[in-house]
Amino acid sequence: LTIHTVMENMVVGILLIFALQWLFLGNLRSAIIVAATIPFALAFAILILVLQGESANLLSVGALDFGLVVDACVIMVENIFRHMVERSAAAENGQGRYTMASRFGAVLGASSEVSRGIFFAAAIIIASFLPLFTLTGVEGHIFGPMAKTYAYAITGGLIATFTVAPVLATL
């Protein structure tokens, strides 16, 4: 397993997530927004690992599951775009104009609808990795960094879901 192989697999994973998001939601913009959160989450995880003195090695970073990382963002972005379509349709039916303010309102409305569920789902996933933080010995050296990488990447994905995704959707 080389760094080249891991990087290659990461790129393929991001492209697959992008393609599936675009295929199933039928919205190129939402696919781009979801794909944009992956580098943020990965950088966040590696930064936290390095700041803690941990090694962001091939085993820990290579084990990442981007599906878990972007899960919350997919839900948020889909709900935001659903709200935007509803507001746009209302504007076309003569119920006001569709402006930047109405886009912002759609983002706020959509975010408030799903934020608790997204937060608690991510918290449960992160909590499932916490026992692995305390392992000692060989197991701790193998599974500890992997668990931390997962937890930090999901936390980074959650931060991106509540910050990066709504801003990009508003533009």
PLM regions: where:
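Hydrophobic regular secondary-structure detector
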Residues: 1-171
